[in-house]
Swiss-Prot record:
NCBIfam families: betagal_LacZ_Ttogales. The active site is at E441 (proton donor), E507 (nucleophile). It catalyses: Hydrolysis of terminal non-reducing beta-D-galactose residues in beta-D-galactosides. It comes from Thermotoga maritima (strain ATCC 43589 / DSM 3109 / JCM 10099 / NBRC 100826 / MSB8). The keyword Ribosomal protein does not apply. Its EC number is 3.2.1.23. The gene is lacZ. This is Beta-galactosidase. GO terms for molecular function: beta-galactosidase activity; carbohydrate binding. InterPro entries: B-gal_small/dom_5, Bact_Beta-galactosidase, Beta-gal/glucu_dom_sf, Gal_mutarotase_sf_dom, Galactose-bd-like_sf, GH-type_carb-bd, GH2, Glyco_hydro_2.
Amino acid sequence: MPYEWENPQLVSEGTEKSHASFIPYLDPFSGEWEYPEEFISLNGNWRFLFAKNPFEVPEDFFSEKFDDSNWDEIEVPSNWEMKGYGKPIYTNVVYPFEPNPPFVPKDDNPTGVYRRWIEIPEDWFKKEIFLHFEGVRSFFYLWVNGKKIGFSKDSCTPAEFRLTDVLRPGKNLITVEVLKWSDGSYLEDQDMWWFAGIYRDVYLYALPKFHIRDVFVRTDLDENYRNGKIFLDVEMRNLGEEEEKDLEVTLITPDGDEKTLVKETVKPEDRVLSFAFDVKDPKKWSAETPHLYVLKLKLGEDEKKVNFGFRKIEIKDGTLLFNGKPLYIKGVNRHEFDPDRGHAVTVERMIQDIKLMKQHNINTVRTSHYPNQTKWYDLCDYFGLYVIDEANIESHGIDWDPEVTLANRWEWEKAHFDRIKRMVERDKNHPSIIFWSLGNEAGDGVNFEKAALWIKKRDNTRLIHYEGTTRRGESYYVDVFSLMYPKMDILLEYASKKREKPFIMCEYAHAMGNSVGNLKDYWDVIEKYPYLHGGCIWDWVDQGIRKKDENGREFWAYGGDFGDTPNDGNFCINGVVLPDRTPEPELYEVKKVYQNVKIRQVSKDTYEVENRYLFTNLEMFDGAWKIRKDGEVIEEKTFKIFAEPGEKRLLKIPLPEMDDSEYFLEISFSLSEDTPWAEKGHVVAWEQFLLKAPAFEKKSISDGVSLREDGKHLTVEAKDTVYVFSKLTGLLEQILHRRKKILKSPVVPNFWRVPTDNDIGNRMPQRLAIWKRASKERKLFKMHWKKEENRVSVHSVFQLPGNSWVYTTYTVFGNGDVLVDLSLIPAEDVPEIPRIGFQFTVPEEFGTVEWYGRGPHETYWDRKESGLFARYRKAVGEMMHRYVRPQETGNRSDVRWFALSDGETKLFVSGMPQIDFSVWPFSMEDLERVQHISELPERDFVTVNVDFRQMGLGGDDSWGAMPHLEYRLLPKPYRFSFRMRISEEIPSWRVLAAIPETLHVEMSSEDVIREGDTLRVKFSLLNDTPLSKEKQVVLFVDGNEYSVRRVVIPPFKKEELVFKVEGLKKGEHLIHTNLNTRKTIYVR
């Protein structure tokens, strides 16, 4: 006979039928939890014995006579790995043991035995007594007073036992034996830590002999979504009562008004009573307006309360509707996880999660990949979040082939059905739940089909979701079309045809490490085309465990950090918040893209405000506008705007007189009063518009500049600043300002970035390795300099591996300014470029940075919608985000200028017109070498990156997808320039030293050719200035555009272009360009 923990047809023994959750009850008026009078919490310390397997526990451990005085104590709820027993194991797909379903390891099956003596009051024995386990992983036996009661498997739904006949007044012994591995483990392969133990609440409660066993509340709305209907099923159970009892049902409105709906006398028997009630114009429940009604049910002494809401979920013409309005799923996936408690998540942590989600415009959470604690759903009802409730089924490590998958094996049918049914029965009254999800990545087959058909009969008020069906095409038994990580062309293809089902991305925007690029691009498509209804980002929280290294430094641990094998490393670090719920930069982008107010510029002073909320008028928010001049607020005003959901209103802004500065208009909406999830003033939506681009002033510099040279160095002195260049390397080696050394290392061209997790997934370190070499192995090909009256230009030419070329020019002016110019001419056969810029280090004393550009958090080419143009100031140590696995971090995009300061001296850098930059208190090599944030050393320097740009982050997935094409630095010529100055004050960023702008262009070709010959038109472009020139040369033949070529001409260099013109007919032809060159040729 197989063991009970290795038989999927045995799902439980001795347990009660599933029912709706009633304990504790969340009072929607006070926000407090209520417990019944006859209630004993068994949370707290239990005696605990840990064994290698179930065969190594003492034979009579459940006996009342057994002496457990030398056992340890353990907290319940908890995961025993988090208390030092066994090791945490993280895998994504593979099982931690050799899969052979339904069998699990015999010798290595960690087992925990829990014992606790409890006192039962004597008056309880007039009633029925139940023991409730909300969650035990993965299999457990129960003994009471030495008698075996039963067992249960599903780790994420309750197991409840009737104990009336085995308990006695006074002292009683509860014994629980928990096995880490069971056949149930094959259905719990859910990309998370493999923990074990009694990790959710445990309690005893008593009910009258004749009591309400279950309640099912359903609501509907009429065709106008105005009036409502309540459908109520009350299941009563009699275990020995002989007298009739009064059943009373009372409706309590969100305003606290009470109305009796039912009052009748019922016989003491097992039965279900069904009722229907009409409610005129009830307040509707939604994530925006979570109006909760209460049904108070009394049967004699038994009283139960159920929160519910009036709402309707449906599909019409392929569109997902909620209370008649098209619903966008602006969601995240969430694992139940705490860095200190594992899966034993506290209510405080749940509330923290929900408030953060609401504050960042998230409206949906998918309980990936199992039913959560019951309190989570109460809180989602109360605060307002849509929930995709997912059954505790994932068999990812088993082949999904129809002949192999557990979803098609008859012996696994009961296990699938039991888990899905237990979820539905427990959670069926929560208005926040809009979809039942059958599971995740568990193949497709008849076991899911049967469960889905049962749901449709049991609950017709919600939709059924299961992504696994789409792997074999659409399935009739699910209501929505769901995919994971689809590329945008798949969305566009789906939207191009008439569809019956809405498209939901149950997982998208894989947020591993520094990620979630191009989120706005996805939502531009979603909001433009039909049938597309959003999705849930993977995922909410980095599953990193708080740990200390050998030096006592804290870090977030991931797979492999506990000696666990097999493991999947940091693939559990996919969140938009850190393990302690510190927001990651991605979360700010999510908030911006998910916002429900759209603002568009209609004319210079008129703006269209569109209300994209479904049930909220914009009058609920305070509007405000600000005008920023060069990043500083110069005018601001508040306003109110009345706009019903879906309406648009025009907003007129009185604009000031504007000089040559840069001006931005910022329009925002914030909460006008406190809510349960955020305080008054919390910004829910904003947009920023460029009112006027800056005008740069070109100023002649009259101050002189000196030049000295020796065998190794070239020294340029201007005002109080000295620039030292190496003749051996061609680099700017040192800057001295009033004899203070500014540089700790030379200014070097840099084409590499520390790989992100997405980069590693698409093999960027291997594919683009030549650019890492280019940053280190450049060879100085040529160096020359030129002194003029008010400036010195130092020009270096470098050859890079792969035969690419870099040209750098430093032009030092008499006022101390230096213009830095870089041209990159990649070879034809090199791959795309990770980054284009310069890198250098300065002393650690330069520990404060100010900038004008996007902020305050980090932004990147494809993740910068949330970056607000303004002036900012931070400590260098605050400029990076501490990703769990160190990687590229801290970039600021579209920066006009930045300045590093040591309190006296400022290193000022301004773009021409803009740059990206980042600063780190360590080196790039440090960042790339270490695997945990605690390993980053303390350095006596600050690394400074001044960049044209780096490629986007991507995020479609983290196992192969590259940044979208429009966010990649393809191998073609690039140029960029910036200005640098060392001074005591921040200079004007819009005043530049005047330099020649001349570009000499010559065009030549044959004067006469024969018909059929090719005409070769040659252009020579001489750049005799210290700045690179980028030109687009357009060739016209007889007034018609013939060809376009782009060229970058480095400083002091001549470039040649040759156009070939074919097919000229006999006669005279005019050849000219957009560069004011022309020539007439003749064809014979």
